[in-house]
């Protein structure tokens, strides 16, 4: 909901369909929007009965995060949000570059998104052109020959795709594309 750049405002399920309000639980965290990866702070909002049941399960399955992480998360959520807007602008610029560059690589087809810091191109044609079995083999090839780490789409139930992060500098992305072109063609 924070890393989003479409012209239309973000709409939650409960806003889109008020009849679902009493059955909707929204789960989020601070890792992505506030660059607090590893702090492991999440939160949920929803009907009191569901949240109460979630608290019972959570209290028996995990321990609490440290108080420093909790205080930092509260400060992030309640503080000035301009850093999130600036980060989102940077992500959008990197997204636009990466999607365009990936679509110039033979056998890669990547759709534009409205907010994320991952690209998820369909690489089925590249897999076939390289004589590979699947996205796992392509990921292995890219790691070995291009020294580019990607996550096979099959890890997300999407065989024939790969996931690349663009939570890095534009220079790093340009080098990534150069290496991908060298290996793929």
Locations of regions flagged by a protein language model:
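PLP-dependent class I/II
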Residues: 1-185
